[in-house]
Amino acid sequence: MNNNFFNSDFDSILRRMMQDMQNSNQTSNKKYYINGKEVSPEELAQFTQQGGNHSAEQSAQAFQQAALRQQGQQSGNGNYLEQIGRNLTQEARDGLLDPVIGRDKEIQETAEVLSRRTKNNPILVGEAGVGKTAIVEGLAQAIVEGNVPAAIKDKEIISIDISSLEAGTQYRGAFEENIQKLVEGVKSSQNAVLFFDEIHQIIGSGATGSDSGSKGLSDILKPALSRGEISIIGATTQDEYRNNIMKDAALTRRFNEVLVNEPSAKDTVEILKGIREKFETHHQVKLPDDVLKACVDLSIQYIPQRLLPDKAIDVLDITAAHLSAQSPAIDKVTTEKRISELEHDKRKAVSAEEYKKADDIQKEIKSLQDKLENSNGEHTAVATVHDISDTIQRLTGIPVSQMDANDIERLKNISSRLRSKIIGQDKAVEMVSRAIRRNRAGFDDGNRPIGSFLFVGPTGVGKTELAKQLAIDLFGNKEALIRLDMSEYSDTTAVSKMIGTTAGYVGYDDNSNTLTEKVRRNPYSVILFDEIEKANPQILTLLLQVMDDGNLTDGQGNVINFKNTIIICTSNAGFGNGNDTEEKDIMHEMKKFFRPEFLNRFNGIVEFLHLDKDALQDIVNLLLDDVQVTLDKKGITMDVSQDAKDWLIEEGYDEELGARPLRRIVEQQVRDKITDYYLDHTDVKHVDIDVEDNELVVKGK
């Protein structure tokens, strides 16, 4: 690079400066700066000598490297480890680490690998949240307690942040210099074990990716790892281990894999009991045993996309923080720390003879001490199972507290609640209710969706409405209904709308609108496949796996859990003729449209019958109730005569089309006429609807 600043004139200026330095007797009082950095005369002389023979960039790099070497020699390699890492063993001695419960096997395996003569580098492999970092902390505690092989009883585990190695390395060679200092620090200490969390980041870290010869962190460490000169503990996930570490065979063989699985529910409860005291001290909240068990049980049931113990600990922490924020209890730890700070300030004020300030500080100390004495733990909040349910509800949107409070009674009455909304389809409602009661009461195998049903019947008889009411009754709102119109899934590429595209196709990284992604975000939902007979056969093939195994693999290889969903398929393929058709006759008719293995996966095939006029009497009441809900927003009450209701039924009854014509009549004859009347009488508070001359009439008050 050509830089006019570093030319012969600049060299002459530097030579003149050097002559002044030699001729002056007051050199010690002069200061010299290069690029804003103060340097000694010797460093300036070295820079001048190199700058005269090299380009500006090379001179700057040489000076930077010399400064780094000098800094490393001054600070020492041991201090460098302290600068960029945390000594977990020392933290264990100081009692700063949480206890590790139920991981003795993994800790023992890690200790055995570390005690090897060569290739003594364990790598903890497990999914996110299973406690890989906690195992390393447990190993540090085991070293302090002496419960490890003799070969590693004096080891110090240093947790290294990879980003700290890269920080400030703007010149070529600076990163390699940091790595060499790190390696030399480990060699000189003779008892240091490095811990890299997210160790897959060492692949390519520090490499320039060009032909300049700059090496990455993993390339520099390989020789030392194979000879056993340094020992490293790594932690990473299964995917990152496969996609990064295993691609480098030379690096893989230098590590020994220690598999970390998700702990059982029983072990997780014991883990929570082990860390309970620290959470109680931090939040000033009591956490009984039943609360710990509820954290585990509810997190397993309602947060299936995450793993234990991480999700259970999060639920416990969030609940305690929520109660602590609402509790008037004094934070004892913070208050005592504040009193200690004030005592120090008071002593300084007395030393400075600022007695008025010291007196004010003493009054504040007395006030805080009185608060501590008066609290005595009597206002300490106590967590309950209901608080855990509220936390799950805030995290997932599922009304867990409502479902748990009186779940048995709700299960008993589910059929009556659905019958009040779905008119004339008692047989269908009862079949659906039985399947849901069986699943929710715990008498199902648990490896399939809550229920899978095929609703068959003519249009307008309540098939879709029953799915909506199920979503409201079970999950609290209509948003829990995922509705897919199968007329949009009739082409051969429709599978990509369900599970996303596979690698190599457009949209592989964008699966936000697929069914699998929606279920992953909302695992508790009702999935409605409307008019299933229009779907492409590949869609039906996918549903076989969902209804049989309760899971589905998306285009990116992620397994999505469908075990907390209700699957409903609807079809109007020639059924619902008003007769009491036997189930075997229904199966015979449906085999004309669907394969037997598809029909055989459903919990029930439900026939919806034609609606008669008696059923429409209840339906018109429901539709008018919806109108009243709208009028309530305007502060208007409504009274509809029986003659008006009979007139609506007569005008809206169509046996073939079901209840939809009645809905249109109510829309046109009731809502529209009330709207017209309101626009002419904006102060109206009550309306009466009756029949005059075979027409509906709206009168207001």
Curated annotation (Swiss-Prot):
Keywords: ATP-binding, Chaperone, Nucleotide-binding. Residues 46-78 are annotated as: Disordered. Residues 383-575 are annotated as: II. Residues 336-371 form the UVR domain. ATP binds at residues 126-133, 457-464. GO terms for cellular component: cytoplasm. The keyword Nucleotide-binding applies. Residues 46-55 have a biased composition (Polar residues). Pfam families: AAA, AAA_2, AAA_lid_9, ClpB_D2-small. Residues 81-332 are annotated as: I. The keyword Nucleotide-binding applies. SUPFAM superfamilies: P-loop containing nucleoside triphosphate hydrolases (SSF52540). GO terms for molecular function: ATP binding; ATP hydrolysis activity. Required for the development of induced thermotolerance. Belongs to the ClpA/ClpB family. ClpL subfamily. This is ATP-dependent Clp protease ATP-binding subunit ClpL. It comes from Staphylococcus aureus (strain MRSA252). The gene is clpL.
